[in-house]
Amino acid sequence: ANAVMNGKNWNSTVLFYSYDETGGLADHVVPPLPPKDAKGEWMTDPYDKKKGKVPTGPGFRVPFYAISPWTRNGGVFTEHAAHESQIMFLEEWSKAVGKGFHTKEINPWRRAQFSNLVNMLDFSYHDGSVLKLDEVPEASKDPITDQYNGADVCALKFRSDVQPTVPYNNTEAQSLRVEKGYKPVRGNLTEGHYLTFEKDGKALQHKGHKLSLTNACNDHDGKDMRFVLWWQGKNPKDNAFYISTADKHDR
């Protein structure tokens, strides 16, 4: 990130950080399933053919974030996305610069239902200033072979504590715990969040079974201000939701 922000093309750059593992027990939000007739989305279970056709995905959520002059005011991107979304973003970018391409390996259902990530960027707000990030020490290398040896150095330093046993001191009771916090949302809405609706310092509340406006709170977590979306569609981009108060969700 330091190299990109200090580079000559920073003002026209987006840097994606993508992961393929969660590092946790599980995701508390069930991913959408494709319809049975979606081409390329179902296969015969290779380990137990008696189970018949099983979906190849989409899977649980994994960390993914972007750094860009057009993402500087922060937020949580809430659209359904998969690794193919990054390829579709490149397709959109290539079309914009007059060198369009089309990836035939992305099947029609995923192309139609998953985000191309364009809504992750806010083109109405641009901040090209450079943040000073913490310095990261250079990765350890073996002085003789010049090969990276971080794992060996870590094992030598911490001895038997370097490889904790699965599930890394987590318990099943903790598996659905979510870190408390708040951020504005970007993109089309999806399930899996408490939502507050605010504007100009005011928030929508449902106190006493009536909707009204009240002063927003600093942490945006007032119990009477939280709402929950329930997906009612058949495909991710149906954008059909039932909205309820959070107390209906907590029972």
Please report, for each region that a protein language model flagged, where it lies by residue:
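Active-site rim elements
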Residues: 1, 5, 48-54, 70-81, ...
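Sec-exported extracytoplasmic/periplasmic mature domains
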Residues: 2-9, 91-98, 122
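Metal-dependent active-site segment of extracytoplasmic phospho-/sulfohydrolases and closely related
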Residues: 2-42
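Loop/turn elements at helix/coil->beta-strand transitions in domains of secreted/extracellular proteins
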Residues: 8-15, 22, 60-62, 70-71, ...
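Substrate-binding rim/cap in mid-to-C-terminal beta-strand-loop elements of soluble/periplasmic
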Residues: 36-93
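Lectin-like carbohydrate-binding module/patch detector with strong preference for beta-trefoil
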Residues: 160, 164-251
